[in-house]
Amino acid sequence: MMRQMRGAAAVLALLLLAGCAGKPVQESPVATDEGIPAGQITLYGEIHGIAAIKEYEAERWKECYDRGMRHLFVESPYYTAQWLNLWMDAEGDEILEQLHRDWEGTYASGAETLDFYRTIKEQCPETVFHGTDVGHQYDSTGARYRDYLEEQGLTDTEDYRLTLEAIEQGQTFYRAEDDAYRENTMADNFIREFDALDGESVMGIYGGAHIALDGVDYNSGTVPAMAAQLKERYGDAVHTEDITWMGQSAEPQGTDTLTVAGK
């Protein structure tokens, strides 16, 4: 009887996570009180700058959030996510609007990006963002966050160290436009942030090329894609859904972040 009860609980946990992920997932042996298996990574692969995709992602995050998730990983630098976390606690939109100005000329420059983040703040106010990309906008967003920490007397903190590290990552990437370096760094940064959560499940939103479990980096094709590297480390805890098909007939706004060095 006890074995049957455990089996039923496991099935329930799987069904709950499947709703969050948008597709069936594999079994995990441990579940949280909310019914989501612990230590799971659900990644959505998008075409950047498509309103319908951002709306879909906001809906998927709301489902995850309602079932107990709080940590949302995004294809942004560490310091950008930290600004977003400060904005989540702020009354106004000044921080978000400044970030949006920093994103001018990139795929994040459209109104759909503002709508996405505002929806999350309104519907999922305890969301914690984690940025795992190299340091895009290092001389604007990155420098401003570094200066903010210095003004607050927080130079002897992990926050400050990771900010400087992200800035250096951006400078290294744009100096050589080394896509293999970026892909490996994204995986390393993801692992650092995920392992620090001590078993909590997370959702992530990245470009479609980064979440291919059998893929390689977008341009050089010389190293495994980020998700493939995560799969190697975490095995069946990694789940992906490619939603690029939703943007096949749509025209993204802006230009690729990779073409706007440090801006």
What annotation goes with each model-predicted range?
Residues 1-9:
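Bacterial N-terminal signal peptides that target proteins for export
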